């Protein structure tokens, strides 16, 4: 299977494989991920890890993976216009010899990926509404939910919240533009079966879709 993972950056601009904007849930640390320097982050211990290890640097992760399986990287965003993580990620994958694509919730990030890494497939992550993002204005939330940024982002695929399927936006992209639709995050075979007619790929955890669906 391909690997899907998220990237965050340290205060000094290093990219790490890490999901959350804060440290508490996944490490023994506290506070914003972005507030720590790379050396501090590397010294943290991940919760529930088989070995005593910290969040991996993206550079180390890419070297370890070495193109053995496809990689889907989600570039996390705080929707504050900071381009550091996107630029660092694109620089690190510039010479990566393996199948890789990039995606983000933030249209500005996807548009920048289009400029910095046009040869790499890029996707927009979205859902039916963004009411849980109060930092965004109503116009921004509407544009993201209805994919009104296409002229700037020009995504190659859509990654949609599976709870919102079926939905007109990904359906039209798939049926009229032959654009692949990925759904996130599927945690059991029953959910995978329900959305199967509407998607081409899934982000999954906790079960084997090759044998359980």
Name each region found by the language model.
Residues 19-129, 151-155, 160-163:
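Metal-dependent phosphodiesterase/phospholipase catalytic core, i.e.
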Residues 9-22:
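Glycine-rich, proline-tolerant flexible connector loops at the mouths of alpha/beta enzymes
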Residues 12, 112-113, 168, 194:
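Phosphate- and divalent-cation-binding pockets in alpha/beta enzyme and binding domains
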Residues 4, 18, 72, 203:
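Generic enzyme active-site microenvironment
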Residues 3, 121-123, 201-203:
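Paired acidic/hydrophobic, glycine-rich loop segments that form the ligand-binding mouth/hinge
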Residues 132-213:
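C-terminal active-site rim and adjoining tail of enzyme catalytic domains
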Residues 1-9, 152-157:
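Catalytic domains of carbohydrate-active enzymes, especially glycoside hydrolases
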Residues 10-11, 80, 108, 165, ...:
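Short alpha-helical
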């Amino acid at each position: 299977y391909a690997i899907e993972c998220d990237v965050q950056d340290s205060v000094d601009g290093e990219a790490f494989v890490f999901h959350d904007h804060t440290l508490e849930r996944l490490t023994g640390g506290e506070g914003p991920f972005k507030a720590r320097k790379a050396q501090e982050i590397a010294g943290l211990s991940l919760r529930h890890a088989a070995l005593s290890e910290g969040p991996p640097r993206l550079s180390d992760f890419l070297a370890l993976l070495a193109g053995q399986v496809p990689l889907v990287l989600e570039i996390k965003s705080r929707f504050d216009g900071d381009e550091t993580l996107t630029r660092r990620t694109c620089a690190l994958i510039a010479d990566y010899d393996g199948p890789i694509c990039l995606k983000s919730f933030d249209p500005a990030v996807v548009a920048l990926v289009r400029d910095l890494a046009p040869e790499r497939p890029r996707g927009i992550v979205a859902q039916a509404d963004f009411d849980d993002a109060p930092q965004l204005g109503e116009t921004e939330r509407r544009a993201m939910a209805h994919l009104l940024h296409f002229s700037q982002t020009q995504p190659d695929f859509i990654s949609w919240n599976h709870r919102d399927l079926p939905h007109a936006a990904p359906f039209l992209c798939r049926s009229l533009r032959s654009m692949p639709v990925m759904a996130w995050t599927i945690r059991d075979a029953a959910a995978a079966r329900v959305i199967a007619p509407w998607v081409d790929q899934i982000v999954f955890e906790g079960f084997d879709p090759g044998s359980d669906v």
